[in-house]
């Protein structure tokens, strides 16, 4: 008796230990613990053989990883939260009902739309490597697209369903997957059941064109943002480089500062001919007398002016006007008549009271302002501007022609 009691007690302890240390079955809606890096991404054959067929035969599944949901009672965007596992695609066991009691067409209507089949059914064949081996047909795969609204004017969406169902050798639904016969008041409901279980994979297709446009827009926005961010640094670097190395390229802020001192720099150049006050005017007059050319004077570059408007190469102050019969080269500027540099020198000798006004007034009224300003400043013209101004001629007044008959 003692030995039997001890053996029965040890058996009870072993049973209790087994139940205590046995892992609990996974609950519905809870994701199973998969090792890092593992994903549930079976092939079509694996889905049919190891999951759908065993589900139809009521055999134990390898893992409780596919939820049982009637897909046609929900919209596709509501299904991901009902899945057991999945990130970009979700798997479900779902029943199928008939659309009509005496027909074989399935009911594809959902809550706010319907599923529409696309393409033809794809047979799922057993894998085999033997030469001339006839591969067994295991099931059928059908692709469907979800449309919002009512047929036939539904709005197509990007939600896709792959539906897997079993077939026998003749291509019809297997007997194990057919609903059992029922009696009583539930006969009408049972007559609409087409399949007990089908296996469905749901995912949302990504529009590659829209994704590409979005990526390009993002890159464009990033480029603009980078350019705006880098602009202050470029402006600061340009100002520093221009001051340290005498570069011809300056930042916009520096150009603004130089433009504000343009007239000051125009009349305050030293050494070469334009110093402040009466000294600069005297130098200009002396240079005018010494030059044999009537209207061309060349100024050397000056580095002490706030605006370096003289190029290293000699530049003419004013362009030479062409002579035509009856054309008077004299121009009245203010109270002075300037036809040559001698007139300018005389104005300077008289005290220079009107010389500055004459020079200031002469610039804006001179024809070809754009060309002459670049000549005075010593800035090289771009090819397009040079070509446009190369054929410029001064206005010609021909005597004896009545322009207003």
From Swiss-Prot:
InterPro entries assigned to the protein according to its UniProt record, in alphabetical order: NAC-dom (IPR003441), NAC_dom_sf (IPR036093)
Biased composition (Low complexity): 1-10
UniProt keyword Nucleotidyltransferase, yes or no: no
GO BP field: regulation of DNA-templated transcription; system development
One GO cellular component term noted in the UniProt record for this chain: nucleus
Keyword annotations of the record: DNA-binding, Nucleus, Transcription, Transcription regulation
DNA-binding region extent: 138-211
Region annotation Disordered: where it falls in the sequence: 1-39
Pfam annotation, one family: NAM
Cell compartments where the protein resides: Nucleus
Record function comment: Transcription factor of the NAC family associated with the grain protein content (GPC). Accelerates senescence and increases nutrient remobilization from leaves to developing grains. The tetraploid cultivated wheat (T.durum) and the hexaploid wheat (T.aestivum) carry a one bp insertion generating a non-functional allele of this gene. They have a delayed senescence and a lower grain protein, zinc and iron content.
Identification of the protein by name: NAC transcription factor NAM-B1
Originating organism: Triticum dicoccoides
Biological classification of the source: Eukaryota, Viridiplantae, Streptophyta, Embryophyta, Tracheophyta
Gene: NAM-B1
